[in-house]
Amino acid sequence: SLFSLIKAGAKFLGKNLLKQGAQYAACKVSKEC
């Protein structure tokens, strides 16, 4: 259904944002931006 598709997309986006956030934080901590 459309709802489950939207939920799957949101979960995928959330994971991507978490990964990007972690990379950004690591970059800031190590000052290698």
Curated annotation (Swiss-Prot):
Its main location: secreted. This is Rugosin-B. InterPro entries: Antimicrobial_frog_2. Belongs to the frog skin active peptide (FSAP) family. Brevinin subfamily. It holds the Pfam family Antimicrobial_2. GO terms for biological process: defense response to bacterium. It comes from Glandirana rugosa (Japanese wrinkled frog). It is found in: Secreted. Keywords: Amphibian defense peptide, Antibiotic, Antimicrobial, Disulfide bond, Secreted. Disulfide bonds join 27-33. Shows antibacterial activity against both Gram-negative and Gram-positive bacteria. One of its GO terms (cellular component) is extracellular region.
